[in-house]
Each structure stands twice: as C-alpha cells, then as structure tokens.
C-alpha cells in the first residue's frame, strides 16, 4: 500500500501568510502541519509516498527532503496547476500503479493517526473506496456524503448550496486501483477542477462498493487562521514539558511548557501549555496559554497568548497580542497608544508599528 499526499494549492484563506509560504508548512506547536500527516502515514506502516507539489515545488522538498527523517521514501509529483484532487490521482497513476493507496490532504490534521484505518482497509473485504466523514455545523464548504439507511454511500456533492446531510468528507481517502478509471471518466466541474467526489460518484453509479466511516475524534482542515489556532491549541494540550534552554531566577514557568535549546528567558512569566522553539530571546514578557513561539524569535516587554509566532520574528513593547498568527521575519513594535488587545494575521517580512 502506498500513500498520496497533497501539498499543492494556493492557500487563499491563509493569505497573506501563503503569499510567501506553503500553507502545509505553516507550523502548529512549532511543527509544519504537513509533518503531522507524514508521521501518521509512517506510523501506519506505509513507507512509499507520492507527494504532490505545485507552486510549493521548491519549498516543500527543501523542508521534507527524501523522507528519510520520517522513515519514508518520498517521490515528488508536480501538478502544474491546482486542477482538483482527482487530477492529482490522475497524474500520479504511473507512480501508484496497481497498488491500493491512502490519499491524505497535507493541510488536514487528525488526532489519533490512521493506523487502525489502514489496517482495517488492508485486512478486511476491500471496497473500491472508503471515505471518512464527520458531522459539521456548516457542510456547504465541504464535500458532503449522502448515506442510505444501512450507512452505504449513495451520493456525494462538492460544496453544495443545499447539503443533503451534515456529513463532510475528511481529507483522508482509501482507494483501490478502481479509482484510476473513474478519474479518467469524469469531466471538470464548474470550478474547472476534476473533483474526487465526482470520481467516487462515478464508482457508485457503476455499482462499486463505497464504504464510509464516521469519525468521532478531532479533525480539522487547517485552511484558515481560526482553525490553525485551534489545532495549535489541541496539540499543545498534550505537550510534554521540558526545559532545554536557559530560564533565569526571575522567570516564573507554570504548567506544561517547552523551552527549546538555546532559548533564553529572563524576567518573564510563561504560562502553559506553551512552546518556545530553539534560540528565542524573551525578556520582561508574558507568554500565555496555547502559544507557540518559533525558532530565533525575540519578544521584549510584551504580552502574547493563544497565538502562533513563526520563526525569526520580533515583538517589542506590545501590551497584548492574542488570537494571532504572525509570519516569519515579522517585526511588531510599540508606538504611542495601545488598546487592551491586538489581533493580527501578518505575512512574512511584515513590519507593524503599534501605538501604546
């Protein structure tokens, strides 16, 4: 069994961050979202991975390499334009061959991994495809499944205006080689994309057995800032505390906190769960719960909580930042007057002056 991991796409809902960075490489708890998926695939015993890249064809390979650090053998497959999930399967046919495979969207996050899902697909009576579903409050932004009274999949719609159920497709799919004929048979949707929902519907219409499983655990598509912050919160809730850097005697550390190698924290208060990467300098500051501070950041005389601060950025003299995603190489500095809190989405290399 192989894996096909999708790490292309433009990430419009995470702009301006994604103007200069692949959405799958935005870090939660100081680890790129994509890495969680690759680790889950490796933990499930799959070693051969085809990684779809598009505009990310330079950045993703630099971050992931050949896959050896994950215990994987990665082959990169370039998708010239984001033409749909089924198009990704179409261009990966040569790589996938006649193997069963799991397709994993690289910006999705699932608590608990996919070990059991892979095992039951391998060992059971294999359907042509198995899809994962979850109940959502607003299914109109997702692929949506319609089930019969016995739980069989009878229909799929892609981002319907009037959904027939609240069961959204989770970004993990299991396929046999039957899917290859289906992706060749369908036409582009009104969006100009080959939709995987249409390919699965083609299988249904031709009598194939399509199984579903409703997952009850935590799942998020990290396509927007709010969901990225929630995934960061979820990961930090299971943080194993450790102090590898330097914390002076005037600093108070409470709860589950990680201070990375080479970090220096002076005269500050760190309230977990929170993670500080390798090399930051934090002084005279408050770092509150559910905050991730990336490598080589600087925070001076500031307060921040429930936020993600990516590597190489600096915050100076800011009274309070919360619910924010701050890109790489960003500078946030004090100005004259500050409100009680600030909320940002800052792209890489931004510079913001704040009144205090």
Curated annotation (Swiss-Prot):
Q: What is its EC number?
A: 2.7.7.24
- Looking at the Swiss-Prot or TrEMBL record, what is one Pfam family this protein matches? NTP_transferase
Q: Kindly list the GO molecular function terms attached to this UniProt entry.
A: glucose-1-phosphate thymidylyltransferase activity; metal ion binding
Give GO BP annotations, semicolon-separated: antibiotic biosynthetic process
Entry's cofactor comment: Binds 1 Mg(2+) ion per subunit.
Known Gene3D superfamilies for this protein? Hexapeptide repeat proteins, Spore Coat Polysaccharide Biosynthesis Protein SpsA, Chain A
The UniProt record gives the binding positions of Mg(2+) as 107, 221
Catalytic activity line of the entry: dTTP + alpha-D-glucose 1-phosphate + H(+) = dTDP-alpha-D-glucose + diphosphate
What keywords does the record list, in alphabetical order?
A: Antibiotic biosynthesis, Magnesium, Metal-binding, Nucleotidyltransferase, Transferase
The yes or no answer to whether the keyword Magnesium is present is yes
Pathway this chain belongs to: Antibiotic biosynthesis
UniProt cofactor(s): Mg(2+)
Among InterPro entries, the record links this protein to: G1P_thy_trans_l (IPR005908), NTP_transferase_dom (IPR005835), Nucleotide-diphossugar_trans (IPR029044)
Which NCBIfam families has this protein been placed in?
Answer: rmlA_long
**Function field:** Involved in the biosynthesis of the two 2,6-deoxysugars, dTDP-L-oleandrose and dTDP-D-desosamine, attached to the macrolactone ring oleandolide to produce the aglycone antibiotic oleandomycin. Catalyzes the formation of dTDP-glucose from deoxythymidine triphosphate (dTTP) and glucose 1-phosphate.
Q: What is this protein called?
A: Glucose-1-phosphate thymidylyltransferase
Q: What species is this protein from?
A: Streptomyces antibioticus
